[in-house]
Amino acid sequence: MSRVSQARNLGKYFLLIDNMLVVLGFFVVFPLISIRFVDQMGWAAVMVGIALGLRQFIQQGLGIFGGAIADRFGAKPMIVTGMLMRAAGFATMGIAHEPWLLWFSCLLSGLGGTLFDPPRSALVVKLIRPQQRGRFFSLLMMQDSASAVIGALLGSWLLQYDFRLVCATGAVLFVLCAAFNAWLLPAWKLSTVRTPVREGMTRVMRDKRFVTYVLTLAGYYMLAVQVMLMLPIMVNDVAGAPSAVKWMYAIEACLSLTLLYPIARWSEKHFRLEHRLMAGLLIMSLSMMPVGMVSGLQQLFTLICLFYIGSIIAEPARETLSASLADARARGSYMGFSRLGLAIGGAIGYIGGGWLFDLGKSAHQPELPWMMLGIIGIFTFLALGWQFSQKRAARRLLERDA
C-alpha cells in the first residue's frame, strides 16, 4: 500500500472519531437551549432564536474567512483554537441568566465554529476520493444521528439536575476534541497550492454558479434548523415533558442507521445528485406544513419521521454536490463559503421562526410558522429546479458547439 493510500485510510478513521466527539459535544447542549430558556426560565422564543441565529450566522457566515485562513496556514491550528473557543462559549452559557450573556456565549461558540468547521470539511474533500464521498458523507450522517441521540440523552439526563452540568459536559468534550486534534492531526495542507487568503476568497466569489447555488440553499436551511428550535418546543408542548425531546432524536437515529446508507447507495445508482436534493427538500417542506395542526404526540412524531426521511435523502446529495463544485486550489475557501447558505438560512430560520412561533401563539394560530416554513421550502425547491435546468441547458449547448 502506498503512503498516500495509507494516509487516506488512517485519515478516514481520524475524521470519524473527530466527528463523533464534535457532534456529541454539540448535542449535549444545543437541543436543550430552547427547553432551558423558553420553558424553564420563561423567556420569549424570539430571544432564544436570536441567540441560536447569532451562533449560526457567525459560524457559517464567516466560514469563508476561516476557510481562507486555513488554506494559508493549514488546518491544525485553526481546528484546535476553534474547539477551545467553543468550549469557552459553553462554559459561559452555563451561567447565563440574562439574554445578553446567552448571546455572548453563542457568539463565542459561533466564532469557534468559524475556525474549526471549514478546515474539517476541507479535510474530508482532501482525504476522500470523489467516487467515495457520497458514501462517506452518508456514514458521517449515520454517525451524526447516533451521536446526536447519545448527546441529547445525556444532556436531558443532566438537565434534571442542573443546566450548568449540561454546559460543563459539552465544554469538556470540546476540550478533549481539541487535545485529540493537537496530538494526532498532521500539519496537512488543505489545498493543492498554498493559496493567499485574498486569492482564495476571490476565486470563490467569481464562481457565479457556486455562489448562486449556496445562496439558494438558505431556504433549505430555514427548515433544517428547526430541529434545534421549534420542533423541540413543539414536542415539549404536546408531550408536557422535556424528556420527550430525546425521543425525537431517537427517531432520527433509528431512521438514519437503518435507511440512510441503503438509500444513498441505491439512489446514487439511479438518480442525479440534484434530483435527490430536490426530492428530499420537497418531502421536508410538505411534512412541515401540518405540524401546527396536530394535537397528539403520535401524529407529531409521524410528521417528524417524514421530515427526517426527507433530510436523509437530501443531505448526502447536498454535501456531495457542494464538494464536487469546489476548486481544488482553494478547498478551504470553497467549503467555508458553502456554509453561507446555512448562515443566512439558519439566522432567518431561528429568529424568524421564533418570532412567528410567538406571533402564532399570541394570535391563537399555531399553524402560522409551520405553513410559512413549508411555503419557503416549496419556493426553494422551484428555485433549485430552475438553476439545475439552466445548468443542463448550458451543458447541452457546449456539447452541440463542440
UniProtKB/Swiss-Prot annotation:
UniProt keyword list = Cell inner membrane, Cell membrane, Membrane, Transmembrane, Transmembrane helix, Transport
Q: Which Pfam families match?
A: MFS_1
Assign the protein's first listed, main location to one coarse class: membrane
Q: Which GO terms describe its cellular component?
A: plasma membrane
Compartmental location: Cell inner membrane
**Which residue ranges are assigned to the Cytoplasmic compartment in the record's topology?**
1-12, 117-138, 186-213, 265-276, 321-339, 389-402
| One GO molecular-function entry | transmembrane transporter activity
Q: Which residues are listed as membrane-spanning?
A: 13-33, 99-116, 139-159, 165-185, 214-234, 244-264, 277-297, 300-320, 340-360, 368-388
Tell me the residue ranges located in the Periplasmic compartment per UniProt. 34-98, 160-164, 235-243, 298-299, 361-367
Q: How does it sit in the membrane?
A: Multi-pass membrane protein
Family matches, as InterPro entries = MFS, MFS_dom, MFS_trans_sf, MFS_Transporters, Multidrug-R_MdtH
Q: Which NCBIfam families does the record associate with it? A: PRK11646.1 (NF008650)
Q: Which family does it belong to?
A: Belongs to the major facilitator superfamily. DHA1 family. MdtH (TC 2.A.1.2.21) subfamily.
Matches recorded under PANTHER family: MULTIDRUG RESISTANCE PROTEIN MDTH (PTHR23517:SF2), RESISTANCE PROTEIN MDTM, PUTATIVE-RELATED-RELATED (PTHR23517)
**What name has this protein been given in UniProt?**
Multidrug resistance protein MdtH
Which species expresses this protein natively? Shigella flexneri
The UniProt gene name for this protein comes to: mdtH
